[in-house]
Amino acid sequence: MAIMRELVDAYFKEHGLIDHQIESYNDFVENRLQKIIDEVGYIETEITGGYKVKLGKIKVGKPVIKEADGSIRPITPMEARIRDLTYSVPLYLEMTPIIGEGEDAREGETVEVYIGELPVMLGSKICHLYGKSREELIDLGEDPEDPFGYFIINGTEKVLITQEDLIPNRILCEKAERSGKIVDVAKVFSTRHGFRALCTVERHPDGLLYATFPGMPGQIPLVILMKALGAETDKDIIESIDDERFFMEIVLNIQEIREEHNINSPEDALEFIGKRVAPGQAKDYRLKRAETVLCNYLLPHLGVTKEDFPKKIRFLGIMARNALELYFGYRGEDDKDHYAYKRAKLAGDLMEDLFRYAFSQLVKDIKYQLERQTLRNKTPSIQAAVRSDILTERIKHAMATGTWVGGKTGVSQLLDRTSYLATNSQLRRIVSPLSRSQPHFEARELHGTHWGKICPSETPEGPNCGLVKNFAIMCKVTREEDDSKVIELLKSFGINVS
């Protein structure tokens, strides 16, 4: 028994109970902040003669406070609690004006602009408490046994509750009811840069395959969609599904669409989609709008340019094959409650979503302010155009109220200080997005894949039972890794990755 105690103590010296939250936040600050800036790249304006702003490196400061007399000095978490302040760091962003258009464009002087405040997670690398000994923590007014992993917003301790989510960019198969009939569905939550699109391929009882995705009213026959993406011949469509078992099914679909809609080329298919997404508009506009919808809303995780259309054709073919396999009994429905199909959105992931939204609002405001300066016959000034409270207030408001991007509520909660155990329990909580008012019997039950990951007993009674869960004591949450490294490694082994 003594050996077991030593082993457990040794484990928790290396892996803290709240490490998953702190590590996720550190990854957000060190990597994902810059990634969000790079996604935007430039701030384009409508200023005559050409004027845009190139965004560079983002710099994260240390927690400081600006006093009434204008002086700036470091602030500790305890002072933030006592004075009802937000424990945050200043953010600075390199911005370079580009004046002119085309070959005449020239870069101006790069300036480092203060863009707002970012709340700091206690215990993270940018916190004053990071790496401090027990004695130093006591001197700073902190409890050395405090797990940290929370924020201080307007003097109140707030914790971001881990959100359980279905895995993005993975095909799931299920049978669904449509107008009293059972259809076989292959669906994927295609996710890119915070945008989430549900794309489906369905086999209807008449044997025809249909697809749905955002931006497209109603269902569209899969054959027409593939042709619009560039599948010029029937052979291209058959090869994308690449399964001899379903050859006759695909031929039936191709023949049916040809007879009913008389669509024989990619141009015909684009025109068909254009009439759906831009009815009553000029032909050129309809075609352009159809291409835009296919680029941005159909499987965006594969890319958002026309060059990515072949990948989308191949992916749709795999989805169609999965739906047909489900219908003919070659595979069963996927178990949505299996933990292989779940992902935990930790503090870093939630902060990434929030910062991306807040930064997009700041970018819109900078564009507006620059254009307004020129209308008043002033020389555009980046420093004058940046209103830092835009970013700061949106982040603070979300963390203070718990209302998150996408309309989620209860993401940020008041830290439970009833007892030490209650605090640790709340910091290791994981919440399902399902409605509390619905039965969801299967989602609430224990699943075999919860073993070692989810505590089987710690869940509340009442409507939250089984939907509010807690990580098991020795559960360790891994972080998302960059797929490109794995792909390069596979290629080095001579494996064809397509």
Swiss-Prot record:
It comes from the Archaea. It holds the Pfam family RNA_pol_Rpb2_2. Coiled coil: none annotated. GO terms for biological process: DNA-templated transcription. Transmembrane segments: none annotated. One of its GO terms (cellular component) is cytoplasm. Its EC number is 2.7.7.6. Keywords: Cytoplasm, DNA-binding, DNA-directed RNA polymerase, Nucleotidyltransferase, Transcription, Transferase. DNA-dependent RNA polymerase (RNAP) catalyzes the transcription of DNA into RNA using the four ribonucleoside triphosphates as substrates. The Rpo2 subunit (Rpo2N and Rpo2C in this organism) is implicated in DNA promoter recognition and in nucleotide binding. Part of the RNA polymerase complex. This is DNA-directed RNA polymerase subunit Rpo2N.
